[in-house]
Amino acid sequence: MAKYLAQIIVMGVQVVGRAFARALRQEFAASRAAADARGRAGHRSAAASNLSGLSLQEAQQILNVSKLSPEEVQKNYEHLFKVNDKSVGGSFYLQSKVVRAKERLDEELKIQAQEDREKGQMPHT
């Protein structure tokens, strides 16, 4: 009886071990895929995301901007900043999120402008 019980325990541990190993491999693959996707976004953009604490997509969602145009960013920023003003019953937390999102988008616009200038200055060979 003890022999069968020991065999059942060993088999159970093996099954759980294999499942854990498979889950670990899947997690590593997903992590690698996410890292590759972030790598394609560009080093400057990733650095800006790290500094501001917001990704470009998050900032665009907060300010409800689909394309990066300075006019649309500024217009939406001003509207959301006024609406969330504490004196009119708004939320300081949301207002600060709006400010951080604008800073992140301004940084991205600056990066894009710099990359455009660098492309324009490169000699054509």
Curated annotation (Swiss-Prot):
Induction: By CSF2/GM-CSF. Keywords: Disease variant, Dwarfism, Membrane, Mitochondrion, Mitochondrion inner membrane, Phosphoprotein, Protein transport, Translocation, Transport. It is linked to Spondylometaphyseal dysplasia, Megarbane-Dagher-Melike type: An autosomal recessive disease characterized by pre- and postnatal short stature, developmental delay, dysmorphic facial appearance, narrow chest, prominent abdomen, platyspondyly, and short limbs. PANTHER family: MITOCHONDRIA ASSOCIATED GRANULOCYTE MACROPHAGE CSF SIGNALING MOLECULE, MITOCHONDRIAL IMPORT INNER MEMBRANE TRANSLOCASE SUBUNIT TIM16. Changing residue 62 to A/Q/W: Substantial loss of protein translocation into mitochondria in a heterologous system. Probable component of the PAM complex at least composed of a mitochondrial HSP70 protein, GRPEL1 or GRPEL2, TIMM44, TIMM16/PAM16 and TIMM14/DNAJC19. Interacts with DNAJC19. Directly interacts with DNAJC15; this interaction counteracts DNAJC15-dependent stimulation of HSPA9 ATPase activity. Associates with the TIM23 complex. Associates with the TIM23 complex. The J-like region, although related to the J domain does not have co-chaperone activity. Regulates ATP-dependent protein translocation into the mitochondrial matrix. Inhibits DNAJC19 stimulation of HSPA9/Mortalin ATPase activity. Ubiquitously expressed. Changing residue 94 to Q: Substantial loss of protein translocation into mitochondria in a heterologous system. Substantial loss of DNAJC19-binding. Partial loss of inhibition of DNAJC19 stimulation of HSPA9 ATPase activity. The gene is PAM16. One of its GO terms (cellular component) is mitochondrion. It comes from the Eukaryota. Disulfide bonds: none annotated. It is found in: Mitochondrion inner membrane. This is Mitochondrial import inner membrane translocase subunit TIM16. The modification Phosphoserine is found at residue 69. Pfam families: Pam16. Changing residue 93 to G: Partial loss of protein translocation into mitochondria in a heterologous system. Substantial loss of protein translocation into mitochondria in a heterologous system. Loss of DNAJC19-binding. It is a peripheral membrane protein. GO terms for biological process: intracellular protein transport; negative regulation of ATP-dependent activity; ossification; protein import into mitochondrial matrix. Residues 58-110 are annotated as: J-like. Belongs to the TIM16/PAM16 family.
